[in-house]
Amino acid sequence: MEIRIVTDKTEKQQIARSVLETLRQWFEVEEAREDYIVKSADFLFFAAFDKDRPVGFLCLKETGKDTMELCLMGVLKEYHRKGIGRMLVEKAKKETADMGYSFLQVKTVQMGIYEDYDETNRFYRSLGFKAFEVFPLLWDEKNPCQVYVMSLK
């Protein structure tokens, strides 16, 4: 498995589409999924390749002079539980720390609302993210937003 930074905007969108289309339980709203795919072209983009096949990706965006946000991530279902998400995050942590950032943050639906997102929460916590704050209405009342943060220093 190789993790590398992708810079070509078209390739970023192709990878995002190929992965997100298979993860409809998390990305079920077609308009939102398409918006993620389009916006992925403008983010710092890491991809996991099994030989030449992209099997996962992670996108980062700057949210402040010291902070990057993990704003989008996906791994093909058949590659779940194989350490690929962890490898993507570890590579992103190293690269962003080397770029001078101090913190990495991520948002997800608060624990206890949906089983699939409980799995996502456990994943982020297993990587060392710490619960920072919940915004009950950031997205909507049925999807309270949990913010996790991690120090890169």
What annotation goes with each model-predicted range?
Residues E115-T120, V134-P144:
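Short glycine/proline-centered loop/turn elements that form peptide/ligand docking sites
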Residues M1-E30:
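Short amphipathic alpha-helix that is part of the acyltransferase structural core
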Residues R81-K94, D98:
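Conserved acetyl-CoA-binding loop-helix of GNAT-fold acetyltransferases
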Residues Y124, F129:
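Conserved active-site tyrosine of GNAT-family acetyltransferases
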Residues M73-R81, Q110-G112:
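A short, internal acetyl-CoA/4′-phosphopantetheine-binding micro-motif in the GNAT/acyltransferase core
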